[in-house]
Amino acid sequence: QLVFQVSTKRSVDVVGVASNPWGDVRRIDTPSPVYDHAEPVEIGHVVFFTDRLDAMEVFYASLGFITSDRYPGRGVFMRCAPDAGHHDIFLLALPNKGPGLNHVAFTVRDIHEVFGGGLHMSRQGWKTQLGPGRHPISSAYFWYFENPCGGLIEYNADEDHLTPAWQERCFEPGPTMFAEWAIDGGID
């Protein structure tokens, strides 16, 4: 029997690593980390295929999810709270594709851990589907792997953080909207 239970997210004691964007140097006399594997902090988001996009959006909105962005008639990015990461769930309607799991994303600390985790997965024999790369809609860095359960898994980091002031955006689907840049089949 499947049972759902309301719970709250537990705090995780993870120290992020400062970066040095142009004009805002924060990491001084300290090199960026090199990770030999990833240690995910949380499940960042889940993506489901649906053939009932409008009904699914209404369902998740009734649970309190807020729409962040959308591909009209094709996909909806939704978050659990007004002040949160870009999306916790993405509902994706593709022609001739019924309901199912597309992927589960695991959040890691930074882009360096995306690379370290991705290279580790490759060394363990897991096949890269796409990555590393960057999603322009959420600004997140990613690396996707095939999953023996079906669907994909993703390491991701550096997702946009939204507030109640965020205005939903609409995008036309296309390869550059999915990935600003990406390596097909990985760098392994």
Explain the meaning of each model-derived region.
Residues 84-101:
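Flexible internal linker/loop segments at domain or repeat junctions
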Residues 45, 85-87, 103, 134-136:
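Histidine-centered active-site/metal-ligand motif
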Residues 1-39, 42-50, 76-77, 96-188:
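Vicinal oxygen chelate
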Residues 27, 56, 86-87, 108, ...:
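Catalytic cores of nucleotide-enabled group-transfer and carboxylate-activating enzymes in metabolic
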